[in-house]
Amino acid sequence: MPEIKIFHNPRCSKSRAALSLLEERGIAAEVVKYLDTPPDLSELKDIFNKLGLASARGMMRVKDDLYKELGLDNPNLDNDALLRAIADHPALLERPIVLANGKAAVGRPLENIEAVL
């Protein structure tokens, strides 16, 4: 069975739903409570690349107050600056994110996860 990892926040309903989806399918995933054990910059870059996004904002909680407080809505910021911000402030990481089969998906909507399983 391929290694599957979920970046999870137990306080988030979407994250809990994603974990339930994996469990219902009998998939034993490594659960990373990213607020307790945040990914480092290298891991964030890997996730970003696996997501295949044009902008790191696609893996950020752009509606979070912290995002605006830190000035991350500045269009001149590059992906490296955005990923460093997530590394420094893991609460900015969108959740859930599932890594499987060399790919990643943000589970909003949950159907996105299906594409990587």
From Swiss-Prot:
PROSITE patterns: ARSC. It catalyses: [glutaredoxin]-dithiol + arsenate + glutathione + H(+) = glutathionyl-S-S-[glutaredoxin] + arsenite + H2O. The keyword Cell cycle does not apply. InterPro entries: Arsenate_reductase (IPR006659), Arsenate_reductase-like (IPR006660), Thioredoxin-like_sf (IPR036249). Its EC number is 1.20.4.1. CDD domains: ArsC_ArsC. It comes from the Bacteria. The record marks H8, R61, R95, R108 as: Important for activity. Pfam families: ArsC (PF03960). PANTHER family: ARSENATE REDUCTASE. NCBIfam families: arsC. Belongs to the ArsC family. Involved in resistance to arsenate. Catalyzes the reduction of arsenate [As(V)] to arsenite [As(III)]. This is Arsenate reductase. It comes from Neisseria meningitidis serogroup B (strain ATCC BAA-335 / MC58).
